[in-house]
């Protein structure tokens, strides 16, 4: 193998990368890559999706991120070990900590203090950044400080050749910098699309990010179609004057052995103490509720007892007592918060602080611990969908909390478990038809009134049907004589599902 791409962006480099993680993985396999790094801007949102897809296709995934420093310059961080992944996540958390500045209504871009990166770099490899905004390009002295912090074996000067004005002069300066620091160079492609067919969409995404048209963001857009995943042989040709920077990518890739799909695991808190194991604590909670809810008046209690013993034995066998106790404890915290927020005299104090849903209602243990409001024995519900010996992962318990207690409950959970053991999980909006019509249409400079009429005609969901919706317009023949209207439908189909 002559080359490994160590700098690639997916659609999780929001409004910049134009390909889904699995598209990058598939293209890498097609081109014969042995490994590929995903380095999205200031996040690892697509890394697990990419890692699974790449491994399935025989490409070794490398985890990383392109991180923005406090001065606006970029460095590329690659993960070498599980410790490195932990440090990368901590650094990204710190970079995002002040993005919601209370003095501004607009979110601020992530920024990482270089001093923090110099302190928390164990298990990470640092490349000096991209051609436009790389740290070594913007501030060679700061790059030198970072090189000293990482050491010669974990800091590389990054060379890129996007075929823009100044390439030769910039790379000559960077090679001189590497020589003066005693570090090696690596070549990267700064990939923003898996294939040249997606370059037009990448231009549109930049326009959307800049809230303008394609003409209004010429300076921000890439000047050509070269920031795509290329054959390794093409990179060797591109860097014919410094082949060592190309070959160094394969040497470095061999060191980056961290596997996101295997090396991370989570174990729920054991809750055991010296006197009572977690399984005994869970039984105690269940027995207390059992005594309150069932009597000896009929045979139902015997059926419930058998079911309880079966579930507790299975939970003990799977080592999940801590899993159930954790959810129960969060629910108890919710009860405390609900009492504080609503007050004992409020009519709302009788409402449950939270309620489970989904397959967990089939569990008697969930019912007895308050995680579900449905008696599965009385309603003849099966446990198998929720919990069985063949489970590939932990079962799923969805707890819905009322809006009036949610904010205080989040604070209470963080206080209870600590900032290192509590996190908010984000979900991302993805493009559907109306959002695609409005954003892509604005980028192409299409008339606002026409876009609004078209948006109102659609079902609001499938952006891949926009071309068909255009063809159904009364003036479709006139519109489709315009190259921009013809491109519009295809671009909406390409942007469909992107975050």
Predicted regions and their residues:
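Alpha-helical scaffold/interaction cores of sigma-54-like transcription cofactors
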Residues: 1-499
């Amino acid at each position: 193998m002559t080359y490994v791409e160590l700098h690639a962006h997916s659609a999780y480099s929001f409004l910049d990368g134009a390909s889904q993680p699995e598209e990058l993985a598939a293209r890498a396999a097609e081109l014969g890559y042995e490994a590929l790094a995903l380095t999205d801007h200031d996040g690892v949102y697509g890394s697990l999706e990419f890692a699974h897809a790449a491994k399935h296709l025989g490409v070794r995934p490398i985890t990383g991120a392109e991180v923005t420093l406090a001065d606006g310059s970029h460095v590329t961080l690659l993960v070498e070990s599980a410790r490195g992944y932990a440090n990368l996540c901590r650094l990204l958390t710190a970079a995002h900590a002040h993005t919601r500045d209370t003095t501004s209504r607009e979110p601020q871009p992530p920024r990482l203090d270089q001093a923090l990166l110099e302190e928390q770099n164990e298990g990470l490899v640092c490349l000096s950044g991209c051609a436009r905004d790389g740290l070594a390009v913007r501030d060679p002295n700061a790059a030198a400080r970072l090189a000293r912090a990482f050491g010669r074996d974990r800091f590389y000067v990054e060379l890129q050749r996007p075929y823009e004005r100044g390439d030769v002069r910039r790379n000559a300066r960077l090679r001189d910098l590497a020589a003066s620091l005693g570090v090696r160079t690596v070549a990267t492609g700064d990939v923003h699309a898996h294939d040249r067919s997606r370059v037009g969409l990448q231009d549109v995404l930049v326009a959307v990010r800049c809230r303008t048209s394609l003409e209004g963001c010429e300076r921000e857009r890439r000047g050509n179609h070269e920031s795509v995943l290329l054959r390794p042989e093409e990179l060797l040709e591109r860097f014919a004057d410094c082949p060592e920077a190309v070959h160094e990518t394969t040497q470095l890739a061999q060191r980056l052995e961290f596997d996101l799909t295997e090396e991370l695991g989570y174990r729920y808190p054991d809750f055991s103490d010296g006197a009572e194991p977690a399984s005994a604590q869970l039984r105690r909670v269940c027995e207390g509720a059992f005594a309150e809810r069932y009597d000896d008046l009929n045979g139902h209690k015997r059926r419930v007892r058998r079911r309880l013993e079966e579930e507790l034995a299975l939970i003990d066998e799977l080592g999940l007592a801590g899993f159930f106790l954790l959810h129960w404890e969060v629910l108890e915290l919710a009860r405390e918060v609900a009492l504080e927020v609503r007050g004992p005299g409020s009519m709302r104090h009788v409402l449950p602080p939270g309620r489970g849903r989904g397959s967990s209602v089939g569990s008697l243990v969930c019912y007895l611990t308050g995680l579900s409001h449905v008696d599965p024995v009385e309603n003849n519900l099966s446990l198998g969908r929720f919990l069985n010996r063949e489970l590939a992962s932990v079962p799923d318990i969805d707890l819905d909390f009322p809006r009036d207690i949610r904010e205080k409950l989040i604070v209470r959970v963080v206080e209870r478990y600590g900032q290192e053991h509590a996190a908010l999980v984000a979900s991302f909006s993805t493009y559907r038809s109306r959002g695609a019509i409005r954003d892509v249409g604005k980028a192409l400079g299409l008339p606002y009134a026409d876009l609004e009429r078209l948006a109102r005609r659609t079902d609001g969901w499938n952006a891949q049907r926009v071309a068909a919706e255009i063809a159904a317009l009364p003036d479709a023949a006139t519109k489709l004589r315009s190259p921009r209207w013809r491109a519009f439908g295809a671009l909406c189909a390409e942007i469909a599902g992107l975050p």
